Amino acid sequence: MSENKFLPICKDDMIERGWEQCDFVLVTADAYIDHHSFGTAIISRVLENAGYKVGIIAQPDWKSVDDFKKLGRPRLGFLVNGGNMDPMVNHYTVSKKLRKKDLYTPKGEMGKRPDRATIVYCNKIREAYKDVNIVIGGIEASLRRFAHYDYWDNKVRKSILVDSGADLLVYGMSEKQIVEVADFLNQGFDGKYIRHIPGTCYIADSLDEIYEEHIVLPSFKEVSSDKRTYAECFKIQYDEQDPVRGRTLVQEHNGKYVVINKPEMPLSREELDRVYALPYQKTYHPIYEKDGGIAAIEEVKFSIVSSRGCSGNCSFCAITFHQGRIVTSRSEDSIVEEAEEITKYDDFKGYIHDIGGPTANFRKPACKKQLTLGACKHKRCMSPGICKNMEVDHREYLHLLRRVRKLPGIKKVFIRSGLRYDYIMADKDDTFFKELVEHHVSGQLKVAPEHVSPNVLKYMGKPAGKTYDEFRRKFFRITERLGKKQFIIPYLMSSHPGCKLEDAIMLAEYLRDINYQPEQVQDFYPTPGTLSTTMFYTGLDPLTMEEVYIPRSKEEKAMQRALLQFKNPKNYNIVYDALVKVGREDLIGNGPKCLIRDKNSFGKGNNHSNHKSGGRKSRNENSGRRESEDKKRSSHSKKQRGNKSRGFDQKSQRSSKGKKRR
């Protein structure tokens, strides 16, 4: 592949194109991958399509200004993003330990991007070119546009627009607003005076400079000094996060005013088709070949993005604050054309890995009202149950999948991005479910029930546990009829706000009853921009302002995590301590309902648990299970659940992330 098909990354590339100067230089914390799953590729190609000359500086050395000068001063300004993932999440685990690999960097090498990359890069650009326009965007900037709790510093930080010193922030997917910003810059406007565009943020010196209808939020000083005020502030942000009915929000930061304009409308189907038809090279830049390429491309190379936005609104997911609740999708023809293109790749083996998005089986707005009235302000589409106005329909998605799997050269089309199983169960037509199981499962179907405790599910904004039970039973019935050996891999989360040890034990009992042990368990990770993170920081549910239990200590987090893997001998002591701590010694012993054996039996040649932990059955929900999987929990468990439900019935539901856990 010729290097000149990529956008310029050095002066020689500019000379080859006959450019004396770039209009924009885009600085990113990721390696340069020209694929539409990466924001750098989309924004640069959209601007190129609008007639602008864009150069790329990927993973510059931030210890000097030299790399920031290698394409020269751009005519209109610098664009800066922190990569496809918040740099702090990219660097650190939930326990704040440094990760071993960076999949967006050659050789997976750590240390090629700084913490808080957007801020660091902007400071270096200012050092190189003092008065140049700087526009920031991407996931890091989008989710940190307000004063926000930062888990890694364990404090409230200012809006990233203030800390970075940038002139303008574009949030969300940003294709519309970045072109409009570019056009105004091209007309001679300074970036800091471009103030009317939806989906952007700017800084005003006084409230008199703000002409739009707006709401003044509690100031940075107020939210950083009082947790109740922080929660109340988040509730306003949450309610106004809508492109139709949302209003401009204003937050004072030390005498200046961060102005967050209402969100931009999502792209129409025709606009999405044009964006995804731009001349992406669909791979990493050739300069990385000597290092073995970039691992991040492997997950998306044979996958197709079909939609944006999510109606699920899970409390721990940032999609609502980034892509929004209104779902839009590409046309069938656009997706089929991309699938045909993929079949021509030299290394394509006949398998499309995914056709999906934040939620694969969402293709349209939840109801007809959303595009004219916006998403509902005081209720969610799918929690605690599916709204009566939600249009549940898989026909278009099913027709799309059929078209793609019939293409010459395609052996299988898999679905690996999130599927909402409650949406599948709400569809009165079983055709999609049957064809999903028959044609689109690569041996294992990954879904995200996350928990079974009604109390925890309520705070997560997830469907009731019985919905997942119904789904898995139906999945196994269809699988058995087809004569297949397929499994379900449920994603589970420990230590979410509202989750007590009793709730974790309830989940452990459920796993015991279905004879399943997860290989990995995800602790709740408080990331910027989510409802759950606000609960974690404040101990309050912003939607009700009632107190929420937060598992904070390392000891309790370890107990909750170990309970989900109670069959692992390494976890015996901590599971034992957890059960004793809450008076559940009835689960210690030799009975069929016990999670672990007593200490007199453990270590004397006997298995530490009454439940086998080896083999595939312990890692997957086996399609061969019968009635034993579906037995009711012990009477003690039922009593526990009943008590929990009654104790929390006044608390309202929460909303959503993801990274693609649906």
From Swiss-Prot:
- The annotated regions of Basic residues compositional bias extend over 633-644
Key words, A-Z = 4Fe-4S, Iron, Iron-sulfur, Metal-binding, S-adenosyl-L-methionine
Residues noted as binding [4Fe-4S] cluster in the record, renumbered to the chain: C310, C314, C317
Give the span(s) annotated as Disordered.
596-662
Q: Pfam families annotated for this entry?
A: DUF3362 (PF11842), Radical_SAM (PF04055), Radical_SAM_N (PF08497)
Keyword Iron included in the entry's annotation: yes
Would the keyword S-adenosyl-L-methionine turn up in this protein's UniProt record? yes
Molecular function per GO: 4 iron, 4 sulfur cluster binding; catalytic activity; iron ion binding
Q: Which SUPFAM superfamilies match?
A: Radical SAM enzymes (SSF102114)
Q: Which InterPro entries match?
A: Elp3/MiaA/NifB-like_rSAM (IPR006638), rSAM (IPR007197), rSAM_horseshoe (IPR023404), UPF0313 (IPR022946), UPF0313_C (IPR024560), UPF0313_N (IPR013704)
Q: Which cysteines are joined by disulfide bonds?
A: none
What does the record give as cofactor? [4Fe-4S] cluster
UniProt feature, compositional bias: Basic and acidic residues? 618-632
Cofactor binding, note field: Binds 1 [4Fe-4S] cluster. The cluster is coordinated with 3 cysteines and an exchangeable S-adenosyl-L-methionine.
Report the residue ranges that make up the Radical SAM core domain in this protein: 296-567
**Origin, by domain of life?**
Bacteria
Family from the record = Belongs to the UPF0313 family.
- Which HAMAP family has this protein been placed in? UPF0313
Query: What's the protein here called?
Result: UPF0313 protein CPF_1407
What species does this protein belong to? Clostridium perfringens (strain ATCC 13124 / DSM 756 / JCM 1290 / NCIMB 6125 / NCTC 8237 / Type A)
Its organism's taxonomic lineage begins at:
Bacteria, Bacillati, Bacillota, Clostridia, Eubacteriales
